[in-house]
Amino acid sequence: MDTREAVHAAARRARTASRVLALLTTAQKDAALHAAADAVLAASADILAANAADIETARASGTEDSLLDRLRLTPERIEGIASGLRQVAGLPDPVGEVVRGSTLPNGLELRQLRVPLGVVGMVYEARPNVTVDAFGLALKSGNAALLRGSSSAAKSNAALVVALRTSLAAQQLPEDAVQLLPSDDRSSVTHLIQARGLVDVVIPRGGAGLISAVVRDATVPTIETGVGNCHVYVHSAADLEMAERILLNSKTRRPSVCNTAETVLIDAAIAETAVPKLLQALQTHSVTVHGDLPGLVPATESDWSEEYLTLDVALKVVDDLNAAVEHIDRYGTGHTEAIVTSDLAAAREFTARVDAAAVMVNASTAFTDGEQFGFGAEIGISTQKLHARGPMGLPELTSTKWIVWGDGHTRPV
């Protein structure tokens, strides 16, 4: 069987499984999620051993520390993965929710209900936790998950999927509700994203190159996620102590994730005081600052659009709020933008004008996260406007169906 047929066969099995999942009760899905969490914890030794092998291979090939951090699993991270499954079990089930409804003058009763999408394909890099996050959210929303991880996490992903499939079988549910496509054949991505009619949506998570390639080449509908050139704008009315805390948290908490700040914009009206203070704070935390000011790494045009994902940040002094918004419009990726200010009018103008999935006022960009938003584990952070935007939880993994109840109604000629 060639790769194309293998992917299509997996998609057909996923379709069959999805029909079973769509009819499960909330209690059945929640029980399956708790069983999956138990299975992941029970298999933690095997999962950690597989991950150690992936880490060793990646390190030997010269993988950067930021990418190793994305790849690495620890006992604490496995506990977090299991906890994420339990959190999803505790979330409201979107399937069957009435979005809107009415009774027409002729007596027909209309209801628009949430229903599963069907087969959800995921193409993702490095992070093995995405394997379980995708499974958990897909299962709770009644979808089958068809996963294509990166070769760098092949052993980790395989160990996780073995645990998940074992738990499904123990619950007498179809194991093909989650399948892992081969990561050693690049063509499997192409065949997945072009399996129109077999796969309902593909969600890419990873670097800009992966995401743009999937969106460009797919014939299956896609949801673009993740590339985050996020800005923190320190307004002229900012509390500089607050600005320092927010900037450091946005940049240094986990620099390898997509909601990290990559550029800080400082209002010219306070630059004389703000620049030295914020520079010292950043440099104390080992952040390399790129910019046009003396003593910084000279910035090039590419720095303003760079998603570093490292302890690097670009710094620019801007004339005012209008200039900050124009800079963000030009270089931002529509992910998360933040303003630090005590001026309510300025905050409202910033939130109204900035075009992004999330806009923060006096808060770290790190809060753009499904768990932080109360969604549980997220399937990704959408930076497009259709079909979802921002952190994608359970409702974003559903479509809708119109149910019309009549009593012998016929439409007049």
From Swiss-Prot:
Question: What are the recorded Gene Ontology BP terms?
Answer: L-proline biosynthetic process
Q: What is its EC number?
A: 1.2.1.41
Which keywords, in A-to-Z order, does the entry hold?
Amino-acid biosynthesis, Cytoplasm, NADP, Oxidoreductase, Proline biosynthesis
Q: Which reaction does it catalyse?
A: L-glutamate 5-semialdehyde + phosphate + NADP(+) = L-glutamyl 5-phosphate + NADPH + H(+)
Q: Can you name a GO cellular component term?
A: cytoplasm
In Pfam terms, one family for this protein is Aldedh
Q: What class of enzyme is it?
A: oxidoreductase
- In Gene Ontology terms, what is one molecular function of this protein? glutamate-5-semialdehyde dehydrogenase activity
- Where in the cell? Cytoplasm
**Pathway it acts in?**
Amino-acid biosynthesis; L-proline biosynthesis; L-glutamate 5-semialdehyde from L-glutamate: step 2/2
PROSITE patterns, per the entry: PROA (PS01223)
Record NCBIfam families: PRK00197.1, proA
Q: What does this protein do?
A: Catalyzes the NADPH-dependent reduction of L-glutamate 5-phosphate into L-glutamate 5-semialdehyde and phosphate. The product spontaneously undergoes cyclization to form 1-pyrroline-5-carboxylate.
Q: Which family is annotated?
A: Belongs to the gamma-glutamyl phosphate reductase family.
Q: What is this protein called?
A: Gamma-glutamyl phosphate reductase
Q: Which organism is it from?
A: Rhodococcus jostii (strain RHA1)
Q: What taxonomic classification does the UniProt entry list for its organism?
A: Bacteria, Bacillati, Actinomycetota, Actinomycetes, Mycobacteriales
